Each structure stands twice: as structure tokens, then as C-alpha cells.
Amino acid sequence: MYKRQVDVGPTATPDGKPVAGTARTETWVARSVCKGTDCVATVAVVNPQDAAGAPLYTMVFDYLDGDWLQVREAPDKCKVGDVDTDVQGWTVISLTPQLDGSMNGEYTWATAPALCANKRAIHLTPTTGSGVSVTAPDPALEPPLRPAPGAALRGVYTYSQTYRETGQTFPPHDYKATTYCLRTGDRCVSLMSTIDTNNLFVMLYGDGRFSASFPEGDAECTDGVGKVRQTSRDDLPLPQGPQDPIVALTGTSFQEYIGDCPAKVELDVKLQRVGD
């Protein structure tokens, strides 16, 4: 059993400036165990209001390629304008051990759809002291890490849409795909960021397919007078046969327009891998 002081850095504005009051400090109690080359750690996050009571929550980390990685999916809140919106949140924590016993890494939080997202620096320092009687769960009792087919979506992909009726292709965009999966291997989140502007959309993997729901938006009718509210979602089945990394995904983009010129449109959508 070991104890860590955890410093989570501030969130940032779109231009990279830190947001005042968003940094925080936590206390973690952790345990780890290795079976051969497979190592797993459990963490209990201490409740600052009751350090001797039940933890706020627990986490499980796996040691992969030199880093400790934790992926968690849970209902969450995202502030859109002045409104708190219910969302499905994904938290990814990646930690790299340092020679002095500390750890440095990144704390990433994103929602699906991508209404909110941020990335912070995180630093763990070994600590000692009394007043904490919380224990982390026994890591030896954790089920083994399962392989995740969705993890194969990684690298740079060109995203393109084609209008079925006319063959018109809309301007393509390149995205860097970084995918993180739950320990069960059945669900994953893919963070798709544009190469030049770091704009983000979020894809989810589950039940053998990738999906993406995009934030609603307002648009003008083609007559330039009326207005509609647009919703859009993509559905892309996992390709047949093993691919690692995934070379291409093809599927359908479903778009609906509600308002003065209502319509439902289906587009062919494709993600084509073009690099690492």
C-alpha cells in the first residue's frame, strides 16, 4: 500500500491559457501486483471531507508500454453556455514513472458527443503521513485486461462524406485518431482531432461498430430564407477480418433537418488511414 499526492493542473481556454481555479490536489492510496509481465494497480481516491471514511471512488490502472493507463466511462455533466447538460463522460489518465519515484502524465476528459473536452497535466508525488485509513481494493482480484477490437483505430485518417444521390463529395478532413478502451475490451472512445486546429469529435466503439453523434447546430435553408436545426450521427461497422491498425471504415452519416425546410439525408462516410 502506498500513498500519493496528486496535483491535477488547470483546464485551458481554446488558446491555451490556464483557467483560474480549475487546478486541484487529491490524495490517492494505491496497491499494485504483477503476474509475469502483466501489472495492475488499484487506486482509492481519498475523500477530503472524511479522510478516514469511504473513498470518493476507485480506479484500476494497467501497465502498458511503460505507462500506467486508466480508462473510465461514467455519466457526467457538461456546461453548454449556462446550462448543465447530461453527458456520457470518458476519463483517461496516463502516468509515466520517474526515477525519483514520482509520476508525470496527462489527465484527459471528453464527452460524447464532444460538447466538452479538456486535457491537463498531472503529477504524482509519494507521500507519508497519518489520518488516512482508506485502503485500495486488492489488485490481484481484478479480472484480466481483455483485448479490444476498437483499439485498432489509431493513426491519421481522412474523413470524407459523399452524397449518395449525386455522387457529390464534400471537402475531406484529416484527423489524428487516438483510441482508449475499457478493461473489458467491449467499449472504446476514439478522440479524433484535426491535425492543424485540434478541433475534436468523439467516436465510440461498442457492439462491433463505431458511432459518433455530433452537437446540434442551426443552418439556413437552401432558399436563404428559412432556418433549420440540424442533427447528425455516423455509424461505421468494424471491417470484416482482423485489421490492426484499421485501414478503412465505411458507413453512413444520418442527418436530419427540423424547421422551415425539414429533410432527412443519408451520406456515405469513410475513414481512410493515411499515416501514423
Q: Language model features by range: what are they?
A:
Residues 2-6, 39-42, 68-72, 101-107, ...:
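A short hydrophobic beta-strand element
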